[in-house]
């Protein structure tokens, strides 16, 4: 991870439940707003409209005061972040003495910030001024979009967030084929059998239909892949 964070742990999306129920509808919405296209970098030699996506990286972050995640981008096609617990309010962070000589809109304490270039090449940013109203909210964005998590202050509680990356399944073997460490996924034959039973169906128009399978989502404290 790029972050200077206290703790991060990998998660398992059992039966691809979160991927199907949360991620695929957002992928479909993105495609419908972008002429059926994904935000693909030009070095990807695959057809995005016939190559399935997979949630191959999923992890939870525990951020404490002064922890931060500098500007970075992720691998894959799409990324997301979900704020599960936010112990601070941006308005309260703005009142801290070290920020009083800074224009209020430029006070970044406790914010999540995107950075991008506009049509003229200028560097622009968009900040989420986080507080408890953002708990259980999700941002879903192109993996190549630069973003940062700024530090917060004045509390010993952790901010808890979940993040993940969606990649193309270029092997046809699901997460097993894409995994950097396939041994983490257990028995190959059993995994591929389960994947086939839970496979989503592609309709040829940019959408994947959801399979009817048992809906479970478990957390396992394993080391996440680097981004």
Question: Where are the language model's segments positioned?
Answer:
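Secondary-structure transition/capping residues
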Residues: 34-38, 91, 173
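Intrinsic disorder/low-structure terminal segments
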Residues: 8, 17, 42, 79-82, ...
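Non-heme Fe(II)/2-oxoglutarate
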Residues: 1-69, 108-111
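Catalytic core of non-heme Fe(II) oxygenases with the double-stranded beta-helix
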Residues: 56-140, 145-150, 156-161, 172
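Proline-rich intrinsically disordered, low-complexity coils
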Residues: 25, 39, 48, 52, ...
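Catalytic core of Fe(II)/2-oxoglutarate
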Residues: 118-198, 202-205, 212-226
């Amino acid at each position: 991870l790029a972050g200077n964070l206290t703790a991060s742990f990998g998660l398992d999306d059992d039966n691809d439940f979160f991927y199907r129920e949360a991620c695929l509808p957002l992928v479909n919405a993105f495609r419908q707003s972008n002429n059926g296209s994904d935000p693909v970098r030009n070095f990807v030699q695959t057809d995005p409209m016939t190559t399935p996506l997979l949630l191959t990286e999923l992890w939870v972050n525990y951020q404490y005061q002064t922890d931060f995640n500098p500007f970075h981008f992720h691998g894959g096609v799409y990324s997301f972040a979900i704020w599960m617990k936010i112990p601070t309010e941006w308005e309260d962070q703005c009142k801290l003495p070290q920020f009083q000589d800074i224009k209020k809109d430029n006070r970044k304490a406790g914010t999540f910030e995107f950075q991008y270039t506009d049509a003229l090449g200028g560097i622009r940013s968009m900040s989420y001024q986080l507080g408890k109203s953002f708990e259980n909210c999700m941002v879903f964005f192109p993996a190549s979009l630069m973003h940062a998590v700024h530090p917060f202050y004045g509390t010993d509680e952790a901010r808890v967030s979940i993040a993940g990356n969606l990649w193309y399944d270029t092997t046809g073997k699901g997460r097993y084929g894409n995994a950097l460490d396939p041994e983490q996924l257990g028995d190959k034959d059993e995994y591929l059998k389960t994947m086939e039973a839970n496979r989503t169906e592609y309709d040829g128009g940019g959408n994947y239909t959801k399979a009817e399978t048992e809906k479970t989502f478990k957390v396992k404290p394993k080391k996440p892949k680097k981004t």
